[in-house]
Amino acid sequence: MSTSSSSSWDNLLESLSLSTVWNWIQASFLGETSAPQQTSLGLLDNLAPAVQIILRISFLILLGIGIYALWKRSIQSIQKTLLFVITLYKLYKKGSHIFEALLANPEGSGLRIQDNNNLFLSLGLQEKILKKLKTVENKMKNLEGIIVAQKPATKRDCSSEPYCSCSDCQSPLSTSGFTSPI
């Protein structure tokens, strides 16, 4: 083999490699372009391609299983399938960003500021939800107090009735209406 044919094979293999195809898909459909970062981290540098391949393979396996499961359930679930694909891609993308940040900064101290902003936004949203839940809890306690205040102080004697229909005492039945004694 000559060196020109060997280099042309290398060029062909490089153009058909998974990372090149993946970068082309990201650039074509999502308009994202990211230059690969050159680092010299030793062991982490050697493990990075393997971890990325494992991430991609698991992404594709989960994507295949999810699409098959949704398709098997009903052919009309295209919207659910698209939602699943988008969600899975976002999870993959988030994992890739975290891994790239780890490669760029092995100490892990400086993740992106945008993630911190999202963290603060989600914390603010959690605080709002917590306040709403506390308000609902207080209203429920007030309603319980009103109900207890409205109940009569004396209880009826239902021991002579086979089935108790009043709310003041327990039914003599061993089971509720939802379960069977068998």
Curated annotation (Swiss-Prot):
Where is the protein found, in the record's own terms?
A: Membrane
Q: Tell me what this protein is called.
A: Transmembrane and coiled-coil domain-containing protein 2
Q: Name one Pfam family in it.
A: TMCCDC2
- What membrane topology term does the record carry? Single-pass membrane protein
Any one cellular component term from GO for this entry?
membrane
Question: Which residue ranges run through the membrane?
Answer: 51-71
Is Membrane among the key words of this record? yes
Which keywords accompany this UniProt record? Coiled coil, Membrane, Transmembrane, Transmembrane helix
Which parts of the chain are coiled coil? 124-151
Q: Which InterPro entries match?
A: TMCCDC2 (IPR031697)
